[in-house]
């Protein structure tokens, strides 16, 4: 199983490597230019349309749900743990500048989201039950001149969408909920699993109309409360905000930037900020993935372009608003780069070899033999049993020593950090991720890891709201993740319907999907995460081919709709 996990992890790293990120953002850039930047120019119109009374009714055109409900159901699937965990992870792995690259990817992602949603409505069908069925798979099947090629692409998209729905849209979300409730409120995972499964069944069995009703209430409310709480954190830490914002932009474009003081000990290059910012941004808003288009196809509308604009705002609300709130909370609270002591133990030196006996937080002891050598400015530790396992460490700046004690995060077992120097193993060192390694003079050893993910966001909210901040983030994760489960169920169901060319099996999918929620809440999911990441990437490839192939049609329809926009503005 471990070998399988390594293989899947390697494949995941490849498919989500630079090529995929360039394709996703590059397609957005190409479409934005091809459409004459109309998505940017008409963003105000799109936001106004989204918040209008007409968007909440089914009075204009045909469809299953209101335009606003179609948007909120799509947002239910995209506003998830990525907005809380993903942003924090990006800012640790890629530095504070990753937030800027999330904004950049979202700016061009607006056009990708518009395009896939507009096409989904234009080429949707009415199934035997009288319900709308649409999405990239229908677009590929009906719009491509080479019908066989389009049919194959559509089938592949639907297959990977079903796989992704059970992975990143279900089990991983349920797992995030159960872990959060377990760590914050000590709720047993099986209890969380049972409750989630029951609620999922009650809502999902009702289909898109029930899901959209719940989403149209829960999604706006949870987003509003999260934004308000985030603004409180930012206001309380307002004195740090200017420096935090400067650091965000400085580290986004520096060839090599080092963050100290406010933003901790994160050391990154511009490419790192770009890589993690774009990747987390895409995971958060799913622009170019094609998933949101499946929900958009259910909207009641008289013009595909009109609904395309409404669904396009999902990327704005998701990344430009919610992710930005999380990022500014982290930047202004001074928690980025803070570490916690996760490993203690001892070490023994023999010539150029050192044996480290480490005890982790679960009291598991690991003994590793290393050889060590010094370069001009680094300490290199190489595992004697696995030469590919190498640690490259640098001297920890003196102003970062014992920073954890100042923030009262260090455990009682912490080893006092001391200044290291090239030529001597003794002292405190740091790796590229900001983790601290301390070899004390008395032979004791400690490793302090950088806090990231949900824990980092909880710390940032706690800086202003205390323990309540942690509760708030946990509740946010629960609501965001559960809404993602609901939204992705509909995505997967419609893809499932496409594969079997019938709606007759939809109820089987709904029940099966709901029961899998329990599995996700109660088991370890490293392998599932990687599998679902791969499925997500493989969904994106046929969708991007579709968007590029139909770019001329997208631009034509969009430009023709300009007359409608002008007429509507003139009449008001």
Segment roles from a protein language model:
Residues 116-124, 128, 229-249, 255-265, ...:
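Extracellular/periplasmic helix-exit of transmembrane alpha-helices
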Residues 37-65, 89, 94-99, 103, ...:
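Flexible loop linkers connecting adjacent transmembrane helices
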Residues 340-442:
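Lipid interaction determinants
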Residues 57-92, 119-143, 159-162, 263-316:
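Alpha-helical membrane segments and immediately flanking helix-loop junctions
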Residues 3-4, 34-39, 82-87, 165-178, ...:
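Transmembrane helix-loop junctions in multi-pass membrane proteins
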């Amino acid at each position: 199983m471990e070998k399988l996990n390594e293989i899947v992890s390697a494949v995941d790293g490849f498919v989500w490597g630079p090529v995929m990120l360039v394709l996703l953002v590059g397609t957005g850039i190409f479409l934005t230019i091809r459409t004459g930047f109309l998505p940017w120019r008409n963003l105000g119109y799109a936001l106004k349309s989204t918040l209008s009374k007409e968007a909440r009714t089914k009075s204009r055109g045909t469809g299953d749900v209101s335009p606003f409900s179609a948007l909120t159901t799509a947002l239910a699937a995209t506003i998830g743990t990525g907005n809380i965990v993903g942003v924090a992870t990006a800012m640790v792995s890629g530095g504070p500048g990753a937030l800027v690259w999330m904004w950049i990817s979202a700016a061009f992602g607006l056009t990708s989201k518009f395009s896939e949603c507009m096409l989904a409505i234009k080429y949707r069908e009415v199934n035997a039950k009288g319900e709308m069925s649409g999405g990239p798979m229908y677009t590929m099947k009906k719009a491509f001149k080479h019908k066989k090629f389009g049919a194959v692409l559509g089938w592949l998209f639907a297959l990977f969408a079903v796989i992704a729905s059970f992975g990143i849209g279900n089990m991983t979300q349920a797992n995030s909920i159960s872990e959060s409730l377990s760590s914050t409120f000590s709720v047993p995972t099986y209890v969380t699993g049972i409750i989630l499964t029951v609620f999922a069944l009650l809502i999902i069995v009702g289909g898109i109309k029930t899901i959209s009703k719940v989403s149209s209430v829960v999604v706006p409310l949870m987003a509003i409360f999260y934004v308000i709480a985030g603004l409180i954190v930012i206001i309380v830490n307002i004195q740090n905000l200017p420096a935090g914002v400067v650091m965000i932009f400085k580290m986004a474009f520096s060839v090599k930037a080092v963050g100290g003081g406010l933003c901790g000990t994160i050391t990154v290059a511009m490419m790192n900020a770009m890589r993690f910012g774009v990747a987390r941004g895409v995971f958060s808003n799913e622009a170019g993935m094609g998933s949101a288009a499946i929900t958009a196809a259910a909207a009641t509308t008289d013009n595909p372009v009109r609904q395309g604009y409404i669904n396009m705002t999902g990327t704005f609300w998701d990344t430009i608003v919610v992710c930005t709130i999380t990022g500014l909370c982290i930047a202004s609270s001074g928690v980025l780069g803070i570490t916690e002591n996760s490993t203690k133990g001892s070490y023994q030196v023999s010539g150029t070899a050192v044996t480290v006996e480490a005890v982790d937080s679960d009291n598991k002891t690991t003994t590793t033999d290393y050889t060590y050598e010094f370069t001009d400015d680094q300490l290199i530790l190489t595992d004697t049993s696995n030469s590919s396992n190498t640690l490259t460490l640098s001297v920890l700046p003196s102003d970062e020593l014992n920073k954890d004690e100042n923030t009262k995060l260090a455990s009682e077992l912490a080893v006092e950090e001391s200044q290291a120097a090239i030529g001597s193993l003794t002292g405190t060192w740091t790796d590229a991720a900001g983790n601290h390694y301390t070899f004390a003079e008395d032979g004791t050893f400690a490793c302090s890891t950088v806090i990231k993910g949900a824990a980092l966001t909880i710390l940032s909210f706690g800086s202003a709201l205390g323990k309540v901040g942690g509760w708030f983030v946990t509740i946010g994760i629960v609501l965001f993740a559960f809404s993602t489960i609901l939204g992705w169920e509909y995505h997967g169901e419609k893809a499932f319907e496409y594969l079997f060319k019938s709606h007759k099996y939809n109820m089987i999918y709904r029940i099966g999907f709901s029961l899998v929620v329990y599995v996700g809440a109660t088991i370890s999911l490293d392998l599932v995460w990687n599998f679902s990441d791969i499925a997500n990437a493989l969904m994106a490839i046929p969708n991007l081919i579709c968007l590029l192939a139909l770019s001329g049609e997208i631009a034509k329809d969009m430009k023709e709709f300009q007359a409608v926009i002008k007429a509507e503005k003139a009449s008001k």
